[in-house]
C-alpha cells in the first residue's frame, strides 16, 4: 500500500512540475538542451557570443551563424528544405516579407510578450515578431552643421545645391540600411503605371540623388569621412543604434533630420523556419528571447531600442529620442516584391 501511495505521489509531482513548465512564460521558459541552429545578421560586436552564453544559462544550446542581412536571406533561399536553420532573427521588413512570400517561415501562435511590442511592428499573420527597432536616419555631423543648416529631408540633398557633394552616395546596394533608404525615397512616387511601379518623377529623383553625392570609399564608414579633413562628406545614412557607437568612436555628435513623412524603420524580428525539426525548442526560444527581461538585457549591453515597450526603459535616452520619430508609411510588401529590380535599374542607369 505504501508503495502505491508513493508512486501516486511521485506521479502527481511529475505532473505538477510539467504543468508549471507549461505555465512558464517569457524569460522563465527554460531550454531543454536540444541544439538550435540560428541564422542572424545581428551577431557582430559581440552579440552572438553574448547570446550564446546568456541562453546557455537558461538551458539553450545555440549554434549561431552570423552574416549580413542579404547573405542570410540568400542562404535560406539557396538551402531550401535542406537548411539546418531552426530560428532566424534580425533582418528587416523587406527581407521578412520576401521570406514569407517564399514559404520559408512558419506562422506561430503569438508569444506571451507579443502585446508588449509597439503597435504595427509584429507580422499580422504571425510569421515574425519584432524584437528591436532601428530608425533609419538622415544623419549629419552637428559639430560642422547646425540644425538650421542641415537638410530636413532626403530630397533636400539633390534639390538644394548647398548639399551637393556633401552627402555620401552608396556604391553597393545590397545592405539593409541602403535598401531601407531607397524604399523610403521611391515609395513616395508609387505609380501602378510607372516603370517597376514608380513614376517618372521618382526615377528622376533617384537619378539626381546619385548624381550629386560623393561616392563612398569601399570599407570606409560615414563617420570616418565626416572627421577626414580631405573629405567633403558631412551627411549620410545611419541606423539609430549605430549613431551612439560611432559618436563614441569618432568624437562626433550626430544630428539627424526629422522629416514630416517620418522615417523608415528596420524592424528586427524573430521567426521559426518552416522546415525545423526542433519546433518545440524553437518556440520556447522565441518565447524566451523576445521577453522584456532578455530584450532589456540585450538593450543595456548593445544600446539598442527594444520593440518590447516594457524593455524600453533599459534603452539609452538617445535611442528613445531617435526612435520616437514617427514611422514613414511604407508598403513593405510592395518593396519586397520590387527592391531587387529597383536596385538593378539604379545600378545600371544611375550609379556613376
Name the predicted role of every residue range:
Residues 1-35, 352:
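Short, low-complexity disordered leader/linker segments with a strong preference
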Residues 25-97:
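Early extracytoplasmic/lumenal segment of secretory-pathway proteins
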Residues 37, 41-48, 84-85, 90-227:
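Extracytoplasmic ligand-binding site segments that recognize negatively charged/polar headgroups
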Residues 84-90, 215, 232-239, 255:
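Paired acidic/hydrophobic, glycine-rich loop segments that form the ligand-binding mouth/hinge
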Residues 94-98, 233-253:
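A ligand-binding cleft/hinge motif common to bilobed small-molecule-binding domains
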Residues 115, 134, 205-209, 250-274:
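Periplasmic-binding protein-like
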Residues 263-264, 268, 273-330:
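Mature extracytoplasmic/periplasmic domains
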Residues 315-352:
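Extracellular/periplasmic bilobal clamshell ligand-binding domains
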Amino acid at each position: 500500500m505504501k508503495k502505491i501511495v508513493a508512486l501516486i505521489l511521485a506521479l502527481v509531482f511529475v505532473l505538477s512540475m510539467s504543468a508549471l513548465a507549461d505555465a512558464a512564460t517569457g524569460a522563465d521558459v527554460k531550454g531543454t538542451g536540444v541544439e538550435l541552429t540560428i541564422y542572424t545578421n545581428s551577431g557582430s560586436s559581440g552579440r552572438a557570443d553574448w547570446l550564446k552564453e546568456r541562453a546557455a544559462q537558461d538551458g539553450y544550446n545555440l549554434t549561431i551563424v552570423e552574416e549580413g542581412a542579404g547573405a542570410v536571406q540568400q542562404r535560406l533561399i539557396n538551402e531550401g528544405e535542406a537548411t539546418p536553420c531552426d530560428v532566424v532573427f534580425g533582418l528587416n521588413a523587406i527581407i521578412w516579407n520576401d521570406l514569407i512570400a517564399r514559404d520559408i517561415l512558419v506562422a506561430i501562435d503569438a508569444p506571451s510578450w507579443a502585446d508588449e511590442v509597439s503597435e504595427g511592428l509584429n507580422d499580422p499573420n504571425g510569421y515574425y515578431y519584432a524584437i528591436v527597432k532601428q530608425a533609419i536616419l538622415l544623419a549629419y555631423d552637428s559639430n560642422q552643421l547646425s540644425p538650421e543648416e542641415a537638410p530636413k529631408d532626403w530630397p533636400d540633398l539633390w534639390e538644394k545645391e548647398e548639399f551637393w557633394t556633401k552627402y555620401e552616395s552608396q556604391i553597393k546596394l545590397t545592405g539593409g540600411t541602403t535598401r531601407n533608404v531607397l524604399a523610403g525615397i521611391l515609395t513616395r512616387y508609387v505609380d501602378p503605371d510607372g516603370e517597376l511601379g514608380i513614376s517618372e518623377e521618382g526615377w528622376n529623383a533617384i537619378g539626381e540623388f546619385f548624381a550629386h553625392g560623393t561616392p563612398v570609399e569601399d570599407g570606409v564608414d560615414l563617420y570616418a569621412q565626416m572627421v577626414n579633413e580631405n573629405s567633403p562628406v558631412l551627411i549620410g545614412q545611419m541606423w539609430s543604434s549605430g549613431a551612439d557607437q560611432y559618436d563614441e568612436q569618432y568624437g562626433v555628435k550626430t544630428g539627424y533630420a526629422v522629416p514630416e513623412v517620418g522615417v523608415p524603420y528596420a524592424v528586427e524580428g524573430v521567426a521559426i523556419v518552416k522546415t525545423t525539426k526542433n519546433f518545440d525548442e524553437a518556440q520556447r526560444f522565441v518565447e524566451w528571447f523576445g521577453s522584456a527581461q532578455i530584450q532589456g538585457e540585450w538593450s543595456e549591453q548593445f544600446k539598442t531600442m527594444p520593440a518590447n515597450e516594457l524593455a524600453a526603459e533599459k534603452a539609452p535616452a538617445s535611442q528613445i529620442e531617435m526612435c520616437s520619430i514617427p514611422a514613414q508609411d511604407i508598403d513593405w510588401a510592395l518593396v519586397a516584391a520590387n527592391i531587387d529590380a529597383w536596385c538593378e535599374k539604379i545600378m545600371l542607369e544611375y550609379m556613376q
